[in-house]
Every structure is written in C-alpha cells, then in structure tokens.
C-alpha cells in the first residue's frame, strides 16, 4: 500500500475510539499492507485480544510475507500462545514456508507450541501462498485511496451513534476544529440549493431591536425603537390595552399605554376610560399621552398639545406668562409631551396609576392645552377647562383621570399621577409637565392638579390653565419675570416649574392660594397623591415662584400645602418649598410642612433664584425651575419628588441642592431662600448649585434627613408624600403617601430613599453617587419601585453625579438627568441610567445623560430630554447637554437659549440617543421628547 493510503488508514484508526471502529477502519480498506505496515498497525491495538482481532482483519489484506517478516509481526505479541494464533492467521500469506527456522525459533521453550508451529507451517506450505506479491499489491485498488466507498469514520461515525457519512464528502479532517472532527461534516446543502439565487419565500424582516439609536431627528418613522414614531401610534391609540401589548415591543410607549391602560383602568376607571379616551378622545391628551406613547399620536397630540399648550397659553392667557410661556410651552410642551411619554411610561410604570396619569399627564401635557386633555376637545378649551377644571379639578381628576387616576385621582391625583410620572416627568418637566401633566390630567388636571390643589381658588383659573400653561407660564410668569427673563427656557422650564409654582404663584399671586395650591397639588399630587405633594412639588415651585405671593397661596393650595405653604408661604420661598415640601407635607404641614418649609425654602429659593439670577439661570430654567421644581419636587422634599418633578430638572442641583440642601438647610431657611438659595439655589445657581447640590446631596443624603429634615415630620409622615416621598421612599413612608405617591414617593423616595439610602453616596458624591446611584438606585428603585423610585434613585444619583460633574450646570443637568431618571424610569434602568449617567455625567452629563438616558429609559434621556421635557428644564438638560456649562448658563440665560437648549438637548446626544423621540415630538424636541419616548420604553421595560 502506498504511503499516502497507509497514512489515511492510520488516520482512521487513530480517530476511532472503540476497537470495533478501529477494526472497521482496517476491514474497509481496499488494498494490501506490507509486513512493516502491519507491524505499525498493530501498535494501535493494545493487548492480545485486540491485536489478534486486528490480525484477523489484516489476514486477507496483506502482501505475501517472508518468514523473517513473519517473525517481526509475531514479535508484536507478548505471549507465545498469542503468537501461535497470529501465526495461524498469517500462514496463508507466507511465501517461503519451508524456510521456517526463524519462525520455529520463536517457540523453542515449549515443545507443544513448537510442534504446533511446525504443523501450521506445513499446512501453509501445502496450501501455498494466497496473498498477492508486492509487485501486485495495488491491484484492484486506486493509489492514494484505500477507502473508495468512503472512510469508515464517515460511514459509521467515529463514536457509536454518530451520523453516517456520505460519499462524496471530503475525507480529511485536516484543518478542522475539534468539533468538526468529532461531529463530522455538516449535512450537505440540498442539490437544489443555490446560494446565489433568491429564495422562493420572503425572508422575514429582522425584528426591530435597539442597535444604533436612530437619528434623533428622524421623523420618517424609521425608528422602531420606542415606537416613538408616529406610525406606531395607532396601536397605542386604539386603546391602552392594545398599547399595552405593544408595550412589549415598545416598552416606552407601551408602558405608558399600559400604564395608561392598566394603571389607568386599574387606577381608576375613569382614568381607564380616560386613557382610552386620551388615546381616543382626548386626542390631545390621550394623544399626547398616547402620543407620547405613540409617536404619531404623540406627535399629533403633542403637537396639538404643544399647540394647545400654546393655545392653552392663550387659553390661559390669563397668565401673562402665557405668552412667555407659550414659547416655552411649545418647546417644553413638546418636549414635555415627548418626554411625557417616556416619563409617562416610566412613571406609569412606577405608579401604575400614576403612570397612567402620567401618560395622562403627558398627555395632559400635551393636553395641557387640553386640560381638557381629558377632554381632548377641550384642549384649547382647557384653558378654561382647566379653570373649570380646577373646579373640575376633580373632574380633572376624573378627567385627569389619568392623573387623577392616580391616587390622586383628584387633580392631585392627577397631578400626582402625573407627577409621579408626570411629576417626575412633569416635575421634570417641571412645571411644565406638571402643568402638563396636570394638563394632561386634563389639563384641567393640571389645573386641577395645579388647580386641583388649587382648585380651591384661583387655582381654577390660574391653575388650570395656568397650571399647565400657567404653570409653565405662570411659572414663567411669576418667575417669568425673572425666569422668563432668565430664559424662556429656563423660564419655561422653570416656568413650568415655576409656572407651576408660578402658576401657583401666579395663581397664587392672582389667586395665590388656589394657584399655589393648585400647583402644589399638582406637584404634590404627584408625589403625594395627596394633592399636596404634588402641589407641593410644584407648589413649592409655584410657591417659590410665587415665592411670597404665591407662597401663601401656594401653600394654600395644598391646603396642607397651604399650611405648610403657609408656613412656607410665609417664607415665600419657603412657600414653594414648603409647598413642595408641603406638598406632601403640607398636608401634613407638620408632616409635610417640614418638608414644606424646607422644601419651600428650597423651592423658593430656587425659584427665586432662578428668576433672580442667571445662576439659577444657569440652571436657569432649570435651576429656577429646578428650584421650584425642587421646591416642589425636590423640595418637596421630595426632592426626589421634586426631582421627579420638575424640580429635578430644575436644577437638579437646585432641586437637589436646594431641595436637599434646602431641604435640609432650607428647611428652615426656607425663606432662607437664602440658605436654600444660597445653598442650593444660588450655589446652585450655577456652580454652587452643585455644591448645594452636593449639599443637597448630602442633604440628599440627608435628603432623607433633609427631607425628614425638612419635612422631618413631613418626611416622616409619609404622608407628606414628599417627605414621605422621600422619606417614604426611603422609608416606605411612601406607604402612606402613597401608595401611589408611594411610588412617587417611592420614587422620590427612591430618590430620597435612594438618596438616603445612598444618601451619602448619593448625595455627596455624585460620582459615587452614580454608582451609588446605582446602588441606590437599585434599592430605592426597588423601594421606589414605584415609578419614581427608580427614578429617584437613579434620579438622585443621577442628580448627584450630574451635579458634581458639572457643578454649575451640571447639577441642573444632573438634576435634569435625575429627573428624567426618575421620571423615566430611572427605574427602568436605573442602572443603565446611572451608568449612563455616570459616564454621561462626566462627559457631558447631559448628553450622556440623555444618551444614556436612553438608557435611563428615557428618563434619563430625558435627562436632557427629560428636562427637555421640561423643556425648560430641558434647558437644563440642555445645559448640561450643552456640554459646556457655560453654555448651560448661557442657555439659562436666554429664552433663546431655551430653544437652543431644546435644540441642544436635542442635538445633544440625548436626543440622538433618543431618536425614538419621534414620539411626537420629533421636532422638538427631539431631545426632550425623545428621551421620554425612549424612556418609556426603557423605563417601561424596566418598570415592567
């Protein structure tokens, strides 16, 4: 056998594991082995039995051998008895059998074996050699191919059970991996297969999955990510449930929807229906909400919402701010709206109820215009409606249902709902959202929310339209002055916050009480569920905004709030804070109020600051907003909450800061706006804020404390929602609050809690915070679980981190980020968020944030987005987004900035991140919207 063929045989024998397979490798051979080859083959068989079997297999596959060669073969065997057996097998292949001396010498010891050996050789001689001679050894075989019918390893497999090989397959394993060697060749393709020819059936499209974020500016509906784009809306719109289903695919929208649907329904039928409605009827609202959910709807809604917003503004022209607001609204709104969606979702998640509301809220946002949101039609009407709403607040509530649905069903609820989500979102959005949310709530809600709290008095008017608008606007308005000035953006955002606040304020101003109240509720609601909290949130905002004026009112708004507010009020700043604090607090003044005070303080400070100073400006809207927000939100002591709310956006830092700080410090200083402000706000103002933020953070840490601090009682009281929120969150206090609130609270709480939890880390270190955040997040999240929690956690952390990162603006950014987080869902992905955060923070906080936000769920994205949602806030984010802090500041400073912010935000990665944005705001508001949109999905999933 030629060398190549023999190598193939050896390869087959080596591959075979079992003796039977090794023997088959020999039996399948076509060809003859020389004596040397036989000796080589026998080496692969151990011991006598396998070797003899191999000899038997080789018996008829050998070339004739000489006696001396026979000796070499026999020497492969150890025992003479085995050698005799082998000799018998080889006998017929021996050429010169007569010359048997060399063979016989092997059996000299045992006479019987020697005799037998002779006998075998004699018979072989008689029979003659039957083996072919070497010259013809290859007869009948193809050189180089000992297995013309296929290698045994391919035919029978190497191991028992391995598939049989088929002819025509390559015979070598050279260069094959171990798996290929063991498994053998893969099944050959069918003969009809032509890789160059298209298949006769359609190749199913790849399931949409998030890979590279679609362009944030993509309005073409190409981005399946969050179903943000308009096309998807229908599903949502159809009805929450549908949406819900979609949820899976599109977490963001689904959740929202889900929220909507579930929570809504769950929460309350009204809401349930509302959601539907929103989806269906209140286009604006629903749309928005849904829109938010569904991009398209969203868009429409959003748009409408936007318009509405604007409209609302007009509607609420009462609010002077309106005008100012308007711009904001538009931006924010969209943003908000957009955001809402995310937030909503997240929120939703968080609170189911809330969530729903959130959507609502957002919707409301969108709706805003439509306080009538609920009533879609009302939209424009909303203005009035809201007013009515206020009155209707309740209605709102119902209308708001979404919001309402929240626990606060009432406006508060709505607000709350909103808040939580909204709040968060809203809050985040700052007043805007808040208002929006309220709006969403029905717009009315907003009113209610805002108004709601406010309902009581002015609220209606103010609140209502204002709230949303007003709120925004009001915020603006009130702040407006400053704020507005500050930057529409800021303003707007802030405004939103402020507006809330302002709203409140404004209202407050105008009808201070109510408005404030309204706001508060709004804000509060969120968190609180109680109106207060919500209000507080905003109220704080408002309050702050209102600052004094409002304050009282603000406070009033909540009544509880009010009280707190009052107290706060007294400190106007406080007020806001208070309210915020209050928010939850107020109601418990005591419980809340502490908060409130602090909150108020914070708030006010914030607010004040904002308007007042550029710094705030820096946060500018945010800051400011933040403040208010804070106040409201954060302040609210909630901080978290606040965060949640606008506050976050507001300034994170402020918010946080103030909130926290304020919280803690503020608490007293409520008015201390100074403190707050100084602490937070001012600091916050720009850079300080950060410190404050940190402070706040620490506060945060304290936050809890703070909260508690602030709202010690408040906090304690879970009731205080805010506190509770925070506290709750941490505590669980939520419990009280809220259950929803809880969530909210939780959220906030989460925040808080988280903060607290992480408190230290969180608070202080942003960086740490981030991780902390994470951790916190996690915890709080869980605790917060409610929507915010995550948010809070994340939020907080985010905030913190952000803050630190960018002291001045960052904080806000952070805040914003945070907010979003919370909003978004922070929960959803707290971690993600955080992570994003962290990195985002560092780098550009905002954008990262935002981008990350995507991660965050949107919320984060929202970061910028969120804020964007804030719109004004966004500004914040924007700021942050603007990578440069200065930019931030600048932005803050001007309204233009605001839009720029938006844009920036938008442009910022965040937006990019969230192309999903398409939600409804493609344009917008990409950023803001986007994040939210995305968020929802993110968040949603997370929350879910």
UniProtKB/Swiss-Prot annotation:
Region (Disordered): 233-285, 369-396, 608-633, 912-944
Entry keyword Acetylation: yes
Domain of life per record: Eukaryota
Compositional bias segments (type: Polar residues): 248-274, 932-944
Residues found modified as N-acetylmethionine: 1
UniProt keyword terms in alphabetical order: Acetylation
Biased composition range(s): Low complexity: 275-285
Post-translational modification: Glycosylated. Interaction with OGT leads to GlcNAcylation.
Keyword Thylakoid: no
Free-text function comment from the UniProt entry: Mediates OGT interaction with and O-GlcNAcylation of TET2 to control TET2 stabilization at enhancers and CpG islands (CGIs).
The protein's assembly and partners: Interacts with TET2 and OGT; this interaction mediates TET2 O-GlcNAcylation and stability by promoting the interaction between OGT and TET2. Interacts with KDM6A. Interacts with TET1.
Name of the molecule in the record: Proline and serine-rich protein 1
Gene (name only): PROSER1
């Amino acid at each position: 056998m030629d060398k190549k063929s023999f190598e193939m045989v050896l390869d087959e024998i080596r591959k075979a594991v079992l003796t039977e397979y090794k023997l088959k490798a020999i039996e399948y051979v076509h060809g003859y082995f020389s004596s040397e080859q036989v000796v080589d083959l026998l080496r692969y068989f151990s011991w006598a039995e396998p070797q003899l079997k191999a000899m038997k297999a080789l018996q008829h596959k050998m070339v004739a051998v000489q006696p001396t060669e026979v000796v070499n073969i026999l020497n492969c065997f150890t025992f003479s008895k085995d050698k005799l057996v082998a000799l018998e097998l080889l006998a017929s292949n021996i050429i010169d059998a007569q010359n048997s001396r060399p063979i016989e010498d092997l059996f000299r010891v045992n006479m019987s074996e020697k005799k037998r050996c002779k006998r075998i050789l004699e018979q072989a001689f008689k029979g003659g050699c039957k083996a072919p001679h070497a010259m013809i050894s290859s007869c009948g075989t193809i050189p180089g191919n000992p297995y013309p019918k296929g290698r045994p390893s391919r035919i029978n497999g190497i191991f028992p059970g391995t598939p049989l090989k088929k002819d025509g397959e390559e015979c070598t394993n050279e260069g094959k991996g171990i798996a290929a060697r063991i498994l053998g060749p893969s099944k050959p393709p069918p003969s009809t297969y032509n890789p160059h020819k298209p298949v006769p059936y359609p190749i199913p499209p790849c399931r949409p999955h998030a890979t590279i974020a679609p362009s944030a500016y993509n309005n073409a509906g190409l981005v399946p990510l969050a179903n943000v784009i308009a096309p998807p809306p229908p599903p949502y719109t159809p009805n929450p449930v549908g949406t819900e289903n979609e949820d899976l695919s599109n977490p963001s929208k689904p959740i929202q929807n889900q929220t909507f649907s579930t929570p809504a329904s769950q929460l309350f039928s009204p809401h349930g229906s509302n959601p539907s409605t929103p989806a269906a009827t209140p286009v604006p609202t629903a749309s928005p909400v849904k829109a938010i959910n569904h991009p398209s709807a969203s868009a429409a809604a959003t748009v409408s919402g936007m318009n509405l917003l604007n409209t609302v503004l007009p509607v609420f022209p009462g609010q002077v701010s309106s005008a100012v607001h308007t711009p904001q609204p538009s931006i924010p709104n969209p943003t908000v709206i957009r955001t809402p969606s995310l937030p909503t979702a997240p929120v939703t998640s968080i609170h189911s109820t809330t969530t729903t509301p959130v959507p609502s809220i957002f919707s409301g946002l969108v709706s805003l215009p439509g306080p009538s949101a609920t009533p879609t039609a009302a939209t424009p009407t909303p203005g009035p409606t809201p007013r009515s709403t206020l009155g209707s607040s309740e209605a709102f509530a119902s209308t708001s249902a979404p919001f309402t649905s929240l626990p606060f069903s009432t406006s508060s609820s709505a607000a709350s709902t909103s808040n939580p989500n909204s709040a968060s979102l809203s809050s985040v959005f700052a007043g805007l959202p808040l208002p929006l949310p309220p709006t969403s709530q029905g717009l009315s809600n907003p009113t209610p929310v805002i108004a709601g709290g406010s309902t009581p008095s002015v609220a209606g008017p103010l609140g209502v339209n204002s709230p949303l608008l007003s709120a925004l606007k009001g915020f603006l308005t009130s702040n407006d002055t400053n704020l507005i000035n500050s930057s529409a953006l800021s303003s707007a955002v802030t405004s939103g916050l402020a507006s809330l606040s302002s709203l409140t304020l404004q209202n407050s101003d105008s009808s201070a009480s109510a408005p404030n109240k309204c706001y508060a509720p709004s804000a509060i609601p969120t968190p609180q569920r109680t109106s207060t909290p919500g209000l507080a949130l905003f109220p704080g905002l408002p309050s702050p905004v209102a600052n004094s004026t409002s304050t009282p009112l603000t406070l009033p708004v909540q009544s509880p709030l009010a009280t707190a507010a009052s107290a706060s009020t007294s400190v106007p700043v406080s007020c806001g804070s208070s309210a915020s604090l209050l928010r939850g607090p107020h109601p418990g003044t005591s419980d809340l109020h502490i908060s409130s005070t602090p909150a108020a303080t914070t708030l006010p400070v914030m607010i004040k600051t904002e308007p007042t100073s550029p710094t705030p400006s820096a946060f500018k809207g945010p800051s400011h907003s933040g403040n208010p927000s804070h106040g409201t939100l954060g302040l609210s002591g909630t901080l978290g909450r606040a965060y949640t709310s606008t506050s976050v956006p507001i300034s994170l830092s402020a918010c946080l800061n103030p909130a926290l700080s304020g919280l803690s410090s503020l608490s007293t200083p409520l008015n201390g706006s100074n403190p707050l402000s100084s602490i937070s706000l001012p600091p916050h103002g720009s850079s300080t804020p950060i410190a404050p933020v940190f402070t706040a953070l620490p506060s945060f840490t304290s936050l809890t404390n703070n909260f508690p601090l602030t709202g010690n009682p408040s906090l304690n009281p879970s009731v205080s929602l805010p506190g509770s929120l925070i506290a709750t969150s941490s505590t669980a206090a939520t419990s009280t609050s809220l259950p929803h609130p809880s969530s909210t609270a939780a959220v906030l709480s989460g925040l808080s809690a988280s903060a607290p939890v992480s408190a230290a880390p969180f608070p202080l270190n942003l960086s740490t915070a981030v991780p902390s955040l994470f951790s916190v997040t996690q915890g709080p999240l869980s605790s917060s679980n409610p929507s915010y929690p995550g948010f809070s956690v994340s939020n907080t952390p985010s905030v913190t981190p952000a803050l630190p990162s960018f002291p001045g603006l960052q904080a806000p950014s952070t805040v914003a980020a945070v907010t979003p987080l919370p909003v978004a869902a922070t929960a959803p992905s707290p971690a993600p968020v955080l992570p994003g955060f962290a990195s985002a923070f560092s780098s550009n906080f905002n954008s990262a944030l935002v981008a990350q936000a995507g991660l965050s769920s949107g919320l984060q994205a929202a970061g910028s987005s969120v804020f964007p949602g804030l719109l004004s806030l966004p500004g914040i984010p924007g700021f942050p987004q603007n990578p440069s802090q200065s930019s931030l500041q600048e932005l803050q400073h001007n309204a233009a900035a605001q839009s720029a912010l938006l844009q920036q935000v938008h442009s910022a990665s965040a937006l990019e991140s969230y192309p999903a944005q398409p939600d409804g705001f493609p344009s917008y508001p990409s950023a803001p919207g986007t994040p939210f949109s995305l968020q929802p999905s993110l968040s949603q999933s997370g929350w879910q």
